[in-house]
């Protein structure tokens, strides 16, 4: 994409074929006690147990955010919320600055996880992209559910101008085998995405090694929108917030990592099929 460095963000042309881009991330962390943590930062987030995520991944460039996480019942339950501010790749139509700013949008994510034991984990995900700009009024405040760090509050915005996504994730660990599954749902288009994977830990009794096979698929309308939602795409600066392929695809991947004494090998193989 012109004017964009993939995985980094805004870029300017440098000489004939080069690009000049900057990357800065970090966070401030505050924990009033052992079970509560707050963060103010500029970075990315990832949800799930797989190599990919169909809900929120670290593929898109960094963005400013505020987050809080809370452990309950001897850390068997974790609740986390992330409030962030992102941008579309389109610029504000009329601007007083030499270079028009990108159209802003507000995003928030709520995650409720339960780990009754060290082998099983189950989570519920809720995400929303909120309208923060209007061509007539400029920047506007998003709907009230954006400010509520309560899972389930975004149900109020289904069939609205906001883009709401729900998801479900679970994993089960055996002795050295982990199976996991993730489901993404778009209530506005009745579409879904599915992930299923198996990860073999320490194969051949080699430390720091694994072998992972994963399957991902998403319907072509998973992140579809109507005309009112064009500024609320599930993306940031032209990058998908979830799987890099967005929607309308099937993918199977095999990756692994092996080490022996001073030798080390890591690989990733994948095959994809796009359907629009």
Regions found by a protein language model. Name each.
Residues 21, 116-276:
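Exposed, low-structure sequence patches enriched in small/polar residues
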Residues 1-121, 128, 203-220, 225, ...:
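Outer-membrane beta-barrel channel domains
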């Amino acid at each position: 994409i012109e004017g964009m460095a993939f995985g980094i963000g805004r870029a300017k042309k440098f000489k004939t074929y080069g690009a000049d881009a900057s990357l800065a991330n970090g966070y401030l962390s505050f924990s009033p006690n052992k079970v509560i943590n707050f963060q103010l930062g500029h970075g990315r987030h990832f949800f799930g147990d797989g190599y990919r995520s169909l809900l929120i991944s670290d593929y898109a460039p960094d963005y400013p955010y505020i987050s809080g996480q809370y452990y309950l019942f001897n850390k068997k339950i974790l609740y986390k919320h992330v409030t962030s501010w992102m941008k579309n790749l389109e610029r504000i139509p009329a601007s007083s600055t030499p270079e028009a700013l990108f159209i802003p949008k507000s995003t928030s994510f709520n995650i409720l996880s339960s780990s009754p034991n060290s082998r099983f984990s189950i989570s519920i995900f809720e995400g929303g992209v909120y309208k923060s700009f209007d061509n007539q009024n400029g920047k506007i405040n998003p709907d009230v559910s954006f400010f509520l760090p309560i899972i389930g509050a975004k149900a109020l915005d289904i069939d609205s101008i906001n883009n709401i996504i729900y998801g479900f994730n679970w994993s089960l660990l055996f002795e050295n085998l982990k199976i996991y599954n993730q489901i993404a749902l778009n209530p506005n288009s009745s579409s879904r995405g599915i992930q299923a994977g198996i990860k073999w830990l320490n194969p051949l009794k080699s430390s720091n090694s694994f072998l992972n096979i994963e399957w991902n698929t998403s319907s072509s309308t998973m992140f579809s929108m109507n005309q009112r939602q064009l500024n609320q795409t599930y993306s940031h600066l032209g990058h998908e917030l979830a799987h890099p392929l967005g929607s309308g695809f099937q993918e199977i991947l095999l990756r692994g990592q092996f080490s022996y004494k001073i030798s080390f090998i890591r690989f990733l193989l994948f095959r994809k099929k796009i359907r629009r």
